[in-house]
């Protein structure tokens, strides 16, 4: 890491002293409260005494020389001490006087006068009756001889005495002795290194006595002066405080120390400690301080939020403040505010602020805690911070964490900027991590190729010099640590040997053919006959004055100007030789057009960069150069900046009086922009140039023979027909009040599923219930389609008359809009049909991922014209182009089957024919509506959301059907548990509790527990409560032992409370069959 790098450029304004008003208001603001009665009374008293304090300060200031003189005469002998007092500079009157010379010269001549006082007659008279008028003289005190002490030491001593009095007056006006404490404590040790400290104590006592002598008739003023003078004496006598050391838990952090005076001068940050003996209100204040530190606001006051159980425990002493902080940082509220919206790096930074009161110190520290949060999440990070030795050293078990910012302890330089930003109230609004970005990007990488005051790299040269904006939305600044010694890389336009950095003598050399054309004006009336300047070259001269003028406009303005913007008078003077090219350039740069273009509308920094490029022909080198022009612009204005550039030595050496400025140096990005040729494009700059070649498929597809019109039309008509473009998709919209649109959608569903409009063929209103539910929004289009597939009409028309393979073809046609893909899909659905029936087959189609992706919940299936795989397209065409009632030929067997390598020679045809009927499910429509069909139908998931009563009733019926193994939606009255149903409807119990009580009830015992052996009961419980069969014999043995020892209810509770049940069903989901083999 570079020692010159720093973590940003946040401006810090350390507080130098405390005042009564600011300290009181700051303390209330830190605690997020209004001023208390005592604080208001203290402020009122202070402001009421304001006039008196100002009067005291004015009196002491006017008589400061007299007071200092008495103190100096008390400790110095053998000369006039006041002659060494340096007076503050005063404004001199504008009148002719003789120069007084310096003080030493005046002392020799005897022309210097001093204000000295030894107290007057009455004061001397008092001193006769008071042996020690100014206080007890410390032992070992001896007056100091002026001649031996020396002029330098005398000047320092008189200066110190004057400053002591000045500190006292400042503190009196501020109403807080903090100024005295900050500037006086520790000076005794410094003074004793040069001389004895007893004379200073005697002098301070004399300052106090002399100051009080001016307020003998004013008791209130005497009290105020005595109070602050006593503080001055006490603080001077006090020992030098030790520095505040910053804890250094690891070797990768910086070991720092903060002088105690900086800590005393900083704003007071109250520290809250939870003690058992505190009152209720004081404990509430401590808890609110913890909220402010962890959540960055008082959530009790702002949002009426609190963690009441934790508050009670910490108030009663059940948990310490350390545990209280730990649990707050793990609370759901903290996770929502400071964990979920951020990436892990930013979470670490915020957690450091909230728990340790600082930001991360190093890259190694960030890596350590990043590993912790990646492996264990937020709880592991909180535990690591709270259990760290640093937390114990700073806060212990009882102290609420606080911000350890500027003035509280020494601050590190490498994370300076990010840490100051982290302490701001707006820190949670920044999503981009700052610390790891600073450590990884700024310190381990070279400086970017950018302007030192730019906010990023310069991909275009018009972006240089942009001042850092005030980011209020998605802030992501990452400052680059450019020091004043950093110099930008500039490329010379011309021979590299003529660079002005390596070869300053070649600054006036022209670039020749390697650079821009140079325009010089050397054949004017005023210059003919004169000797050419050294280095002048006719080759690069321009005899046409108008060409030089046009080049000057192009260089200064970057474009041609309008006729009304031209400077006609200056052009005429240039043509007549009355004006040099240099002065003409100066006139153009000071014109209103130039000022409005490159000064008024831009940042000062950006304007200086533009002007520097236009007039001097190169960008600025760095901060040191641009700061000089910035200072000139701030003090003298725009015209002074132009004069400073044109009058510079570099301008004279590079262009002289007769050369138009030209572009001498460019940045690397500028060179790349000007040389985007094929051979010069780098891979990291631009795209790779590809040679244009005709693709191979175009070459191979080129027609070589002549084709007739019928042949062309035949080829055009191949493939997907126009019907795909003309297909109309019927979709249910959110507005279901349009009954005509709903009826149109229902008719489209009938035509898709039954391949005809079924209204003329229905004698009974078989689908009235489904239509009503769809119109009322109780079911979706997907459920409506599924209901049509379960109907008796569909079973009669498309299941009973056909073999299973034909049923699969028709099912994929009606519900997926295509033919079967391959034999694998046919075998899959054939197995479902053979084992579970038509309802399970339709449910598998409608519940498939393909159906959800293509049609979703609100779209009627339609013909999709699939083109992949290619073998499936002709099958779909044939399936759709033939009428269902024409024949029952199979379409899908067009797939070529793979012959096995080994054939069973002994297998007879009669044997194969014997198994033909075994692959068929029952051909009876009534049989499919019976027990087996209901038991094997695909699982439908019921979840209790509590939105309406009808949905809750469906959930209750589903529970009875699953747990009691009922095959009808009509639940017998003697099976119902009305008390449990009422509790579930009112939300007193969850679905999980309902299942637990139902499986433990007498009804379940009579049906599945009493009639069967234990092993069979365990199988029933697995199927009814977990939706699967036992996986291993060990599961049956484990629950057999539990049932034998504790009974049925214990087994039910063990299964319902298991992790598997919680994972798949949770609290609100009805158990459902999770395996296709269930019920076989």
UniProtKB/Swiss-Prot annotation:
Record carries keyword Nucleotide-binding: no
Top-level division of the source organism's lineage: Bacteria
Chain segments carrying region Disordered: 906-930
GO biological process, alphabetically ordered: photosynthesis
Compartment(s): Cellular thylakoid membrane
Primary subcellular site in the record, as a coarse category: membrane
Region of interest (Phycobilin-like 2), ranges: 145-237
Membrane topology of the entry: Peripheral membrane protein
EC number: 4.-.-.-
Gene3D superfamilies, alphabetized: Phycobilisome linker domain, Phycocyanins
GO molecular function, one term: lyase activity
Post-translational modification: Contains one covalently linked bilin chromophore. This protein autochromophorylates.
Family annotation (InterPro entries): Globin-like_sf (IPR009050), PBS_linker_dom (IPR001297), PBS_linker_sf (IPR038255), Phycobilisome_asu/bsu (IPR012128), Phycobilisome_asu/bsu_sf (IPR038719)
Keyword Transport on entry: yes
Pfam family, one: PBS_linker_poly
Residue numbers spanned by region Phycobilin-like 1: 18-76
Subunit structure: Phycobilisomes of this organism are composed of a two cylinder core, from which six rods radiate. The core is mainly composed of allophycocyanin alpha and beta chains, and of three minor components: the allophycocyanin alpha-B chain, a 18.3 kDa polypeptide, and the anchor polypeptide L-CM.
Functional note: This protein is postulated to act both as terminal energy acceptor (by its phycobilin-like domains) and as a linker polypeptide (by its repeats and arms) that stabilizes the phycobilisome core architecture. Has intrinsic bilin lyase activity.
Name by which UniProt lists this protein: Phycobiliprotein ApcE
């Amino acid at each position: 890491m570079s020692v010159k790098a720093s973590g940003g450029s946040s401006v810090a304004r350390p507080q130098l002293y405390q005042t009564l008003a600011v300290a009181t208001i700051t303390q209330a603001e830190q605690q997020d409260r209004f001023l208390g009665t005592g604080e208001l009374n203290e402020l009122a008293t202070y402001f009421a005494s304001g006039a008196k304090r100002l009067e005291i300060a004015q009196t002491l200031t006017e008589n400061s020389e007299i007071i200092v003189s008495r103190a100096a005469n008390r400790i110095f002998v053998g000369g006039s001490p006041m002659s060494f007092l340096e007076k503050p500079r005063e404004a001199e009157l504008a009148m002719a006087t003789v120069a007084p010379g310096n003080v030493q010269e005046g002392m020799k001549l005897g022309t210097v006068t001093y204000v000295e006082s030894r107290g007057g007659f009455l004061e001397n008279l008092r001193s006769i009756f008071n042996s020690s008028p100014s206080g007890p003289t410390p032992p070992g005190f001896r007056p100091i001889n002026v001649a031996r002490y020396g002029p330098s030491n005398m000047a320092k001593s008189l200066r110190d005495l004057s400053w002591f009095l000045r500190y006292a007056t400042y503190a009196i006006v501020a109403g807080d002795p903090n100024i005295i404490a900050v500037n006086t404590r520790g000076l005794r040790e410094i003074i004793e290194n040069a001389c004895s400290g007893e004379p200073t104590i005697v002098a301070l006592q004399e300052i106090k006595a002399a100051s009080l002598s001016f307020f003998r008739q004013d008791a209130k003023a005497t009290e105020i002066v005595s109070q602050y003078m006593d503080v001055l004496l006490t603080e001077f006598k006090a020992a030098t405080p030790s520095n505040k050391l910053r804890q250094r838990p690891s070797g990768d952090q910086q070991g720092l120390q903060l002088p105690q005076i900086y800590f005393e001068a900083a704003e007071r940050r109250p520290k809250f400690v939870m003690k058992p003996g505190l009152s209720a209100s004081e404990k509430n204040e401590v808890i609110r301080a913890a909220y402010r530190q962890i959540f960055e606001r008082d959530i009790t006051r702002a949002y009426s939020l609190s963690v009441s159980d934790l508050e009670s425990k910490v108030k009663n002493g059940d948990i310490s403040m350390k545990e209280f902080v730990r649990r707050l940082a793990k609370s759901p509220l903290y996770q929502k505010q400071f964990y979920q919206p951020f990436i892990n790096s930013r979470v670490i930074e915020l957690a450091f602020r909230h728990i340790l009161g600082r930001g991360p110190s190093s890259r190694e520290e960030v890596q350590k805690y990043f590993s912790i949060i990646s492996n264990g999440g937020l709880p592991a990070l909180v535990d690591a911070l709270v259990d760290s030795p640093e937390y114990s050293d700073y806060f212990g078990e009882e102290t609420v964490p606080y911000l350890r910012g500027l003035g509280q302890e020494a601050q590190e330089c490498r994370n300076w900027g990010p840490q100051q930003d982290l302490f701001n109230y707006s820190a949670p609004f920044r999503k981009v991590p700052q610390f790891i970005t600073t450590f990884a990007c700024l310190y381990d990488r070279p400086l970017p190729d950018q302007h030192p005051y730019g906010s990023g790299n310069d991909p275009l040269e018009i972006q240089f010099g942009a001042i850092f904006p005030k980011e209020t939305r998605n802030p992501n600044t990452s400052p680059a640590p450019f020091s004043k010694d950093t110099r930008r890389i500039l490329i010379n336009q011309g021979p590299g040997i003529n660079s002005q950095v390596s070869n300053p003598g070649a600054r006036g050399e022209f670039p020749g053919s390697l650079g821009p054309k140079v325009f010089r004006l050397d054949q004017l009336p005023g210059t003919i006959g004169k000797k050419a300047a050294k280095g002048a070259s006719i080759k690069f001269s321009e005899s046409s004055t108008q060409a030089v003028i046009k080049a000057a406009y192009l260089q200064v303005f970057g474009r041609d100007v309008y006729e009304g913007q031209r400077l006609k008078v200056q052009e005429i003077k240039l043509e007549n030789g009355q004006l040099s090219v240099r002065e003409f350039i100066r006139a153009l740069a000071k014109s209103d057009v130039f000022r409005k273009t490159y000064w008024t509308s831009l940042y000062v920094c950006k304007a200086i960069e533009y002007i520097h490029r236009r007039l001097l022909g190169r960008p600025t080198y760095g901060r040191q150069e641009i700061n000089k022009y910035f200072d000139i612009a701030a003090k003298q204005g725009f015209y002074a900046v132009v004069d400073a550039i044109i009058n510079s030595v570099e301008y004279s050496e590079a262009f002289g009086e007769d050369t138009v400025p030209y572009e001498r140096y460019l940045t690397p990005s500028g060179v790349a922009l000007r040389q985007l040729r094929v051979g010069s494009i780098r891979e990291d700059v631009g795209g790779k140039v590809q040679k244009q070649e005709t693709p191979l498929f175009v070459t191979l597809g080129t027609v070589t023979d002549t084709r007739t019109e019928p042949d062309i039309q035949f080829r055009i008509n191949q493939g997907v027909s126009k019907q795909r473009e003309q297909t109309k998709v019927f979709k249910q919209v959110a507005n279901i009040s349009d009954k005509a649109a709903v009826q149109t959608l229902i008719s489209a569903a009938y035509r898709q599923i039954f391949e005809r409009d079924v209204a003329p063929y229905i004698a009974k209103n078989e689908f009235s219930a489904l239509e009503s539910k769809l119109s009322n929004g109780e079911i979706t289009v997907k459920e409506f389609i599924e209901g049509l597939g379960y109907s008796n009409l569909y079973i009669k028309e498309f299941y009973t008359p056909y073999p299973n393979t034909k049923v699969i073809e028709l099912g994929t046609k009606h519900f997926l809009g295509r033919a079967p893909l391959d034999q694998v899909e046919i075998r899959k659905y054939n197995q479902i049909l053979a084992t579970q029936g038509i309802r399970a087959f339709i449910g598998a189609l409608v519940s498939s991922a393909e159906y959800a992706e293509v049609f979703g919940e609100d779209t009627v299936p339609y013909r999709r014209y699939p083109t992949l795989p290619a073998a499936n397209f002709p099958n779909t065409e044939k399936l759709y182009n033939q009428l269902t009632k024409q024949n029952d030929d199979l379409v899908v067997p067009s797939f070529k089957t793979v012959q096995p390598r080994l054939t069973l020679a002994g297998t007879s045809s009669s044997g194969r024919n014997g198994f033909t009927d075994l692959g068929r499910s029952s051909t009876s429509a009534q049989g499919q509506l019976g027990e087996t069909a209901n038991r094997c139908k695909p699982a439908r998931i019921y979840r209790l959301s509590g939105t309406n009563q009808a949905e809750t009733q469906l959930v209750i019926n589903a529970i009875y059907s699953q747990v009691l193994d009922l095959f009808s939606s009509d639940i017998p009255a003697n099976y119902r548990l009305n008390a449990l149903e009422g509790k579930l409807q009112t939300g007193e119990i969850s679905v999980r509790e309902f299942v637990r009580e139902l499986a433990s009830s007498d009804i379940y015992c009579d049906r599945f527990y009493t009639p069967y052996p234990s092993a069979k009961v365990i199988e029933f419980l697995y199927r009814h409560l977990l939706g699967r069969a036992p996986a291993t014999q060990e599961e049956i043995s484990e629950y057999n032992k539990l049932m034998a020892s504790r009974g049925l209810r214990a087994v039910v509770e063990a299964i319902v409370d298991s992790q598997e049940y919680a994972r798949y069903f949770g609290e609100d989901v009805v158990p459902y069959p999770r395996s296709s083999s269930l019920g076989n």
